[in-house]
Amino acid sequence: MSITTERKQQLIKEYAITENDTGSSAVQCAILTERINNLTEHFKSNHKDHTSRRGLLILVGRRRRLLNYIKKNNVSKYLDLISKLGIRKIK
């Protein structure tokens, strides 16, 4: 259900701007997307887990705010990121 350390390092390496970049908005957004995808898979077999569903909604909101920030500052980076992550545009 949670993201493994190896997978997190993979995501950091893939989305990082520089070599030691672990906190840029693109990296944070990629990690949040991975956590959201894991929780979505969890709900396919545990549909009554309402506590985790609230956590999922919090993660989705956090990712939305990060994507809004990226979109406001660099539209081309935003479009590239959402295509790599496979998510829809924010209205």
Curated annotation (Swiss-Prot):
InterPro entries from the UniProt entry: Ribosomal_uS15, Ribosomal_uS15_bac-type, uS15_NS1_RNA-bd_sf
One GO molecular-function entry: structural constituent of ribosome
GO terms for biological process, alphabetical: translation
Pfam family, one: Ribosomal_S15
Keywords associated with the record: Ribonucleoprotein, Ribosomal protein, RNA-binding, rRNA-binding
GO cellular component: cytosolic small ribosomal subunit
Keyword rRNA-binding part of the UniProt annotation: yes
Cystine crosslinks: none
SMART domains: Ribosomal_S15 (SM01387)
Function noted in UniProt: One of the primary rRNA binding proteins, it binds directly to 16S rRNA where it helps nucleate assembly of the platform of the 30S subunit by binding and bridging several RNA helices of the 16S rRNA. Forms an intersubunit bridge (bridge B4) with the 23S rRNA of the 50S subunit in the ribosome.
Homology family: Belongs to the universal ribosomal protein uS15 family.
Protein name, as recorded: Small ribosomal subunit protein uS15
Gene: rpsO
